[in-house]
Amino acid sequence: MTGKPAYKRVLLKASGEALMGSQGFGIDVSVADRIANDIKQARALGVEVGVVIGGGNIFRGVAVASKGGDRVTGDHMGMLATVINSLALRTSLHKIGVDSVVLSAIAMPEICESFSQRQATAYMDEGKVVIFAGGTGNPFFTTDSAAALRAAEIEADALLKGTQVDGIYSADPKKDPGATRFDQLTHKEFLDRGLAVMDTAAVALARENNIPIIVYSIHENGGLADILQGKGRCTIVSDN
């Protein structure tokens, strides 16, 4: 890997579902290990990496609300699921010698450190991979919004969203064979089209802070390093 990376510091958003692999629930350790290896390759390029992982492989707060339950409690349960996933990724990173730390938006000092912007940037300056757990710490906000928020706080050069497909499509390509993939969109075009790959609050926050969003397939081995070097299939959401 000799290509010069296009970004110095990035925030990687991975869905909880990505950690399931072919399982119907929970964490496939082999998938966590592969994502960790992708992050190691990014670090080898000299790129500083922050990570936000969703919790949908374990629990979704909206599922509680849809069945008449309390959305706030459901979202708190979902935040705890992101902590579990974050600890799993940290374990996978440590196995391959990548120094990493979990910072949680919800205080749980016996398990991981609490989030602060200053500490997060200090760790990244030291070369550590920082995994942000607990979402934003508030209900009614998705982990997409948490990713955009943390990207702004650490002054990331880009927000990378690893998904099930290789970019943003006009429709779900798994359901519509005629769906077309976009190479590039502006933040406004994304919002105007009502595309569902990332929630509007996250995209609006990225736009306000001039953070490009890059959507790519998280299932490609070495895909993260390729994207960082300007290679690979993806969609770039940027106003520049």
Curated annotation (Swiss-Prot):
UniProt EC number: 2.7.4.22
Pathway this chain belongs to: Pyrimidine metabolism; CTP biosynthesis via de novo pathway; UDP from UMP (UMPK route): step 1/1
Known function: Catalyzes the reversible phosphorylation of UMP to UDP.
Positions with a binding annotation for ATP: K13, A14, S15, G16, G56, R60, T163, Q164, Y169, D172
Binding partners and assembly: Homohexamer.
Top-level EC class: transferase
CDD domains named among the record's database cross-references: AAK_UMPK-PyrH-Ec (cd04254)
Gene: pyrH
Keyword Zinc recorded: no
A biological process term (GO) from this entry: 'de novo' CTP biosynthetic process
GO MF terms, alphabetically ordered: ATP binding; UMP kinase activity
Family, similarity comment: Belongs to the UMP kinase family.
PANTHER family to which the protein is assigned, alphabetical: URIDYLATE KINASE, URIDYLATE KINASE PUMPKIN, CHLOROPLASTIC
Positions annotated to bind UMP: G55, D75, T136, G137, N138, P139, F140, F141, T142, T143
Protein known as: Uridylate kinase
Catalyzed reactions per annotation: UMP + ATP = UDP + ADP
SUPFAM superfamilies for this protein: Carbamate kinase-like
Keyword terms of this UniProt record: Allosteric enzyme, ATP-binding, Cytoplasm, Kinase, Nucleotide-binding, Pyrimidine biosynthesis, Transferase
InterPro entries named in the record: AceGlu_kinase-like_sf, Asp/Glu/Uridylate_kinase, Uridylate_kinase, Uridylate_kinase_bac
Superkingdom of the source species: Bacteria
Subcellular location: Cytoplasm
Residue span of region Involved in allosteric activation by GTP: 21-26
Activity regulation information from UniProt: Allosterically activated by GTP. Inhibited by UTP.
Keyword Kinase: yes
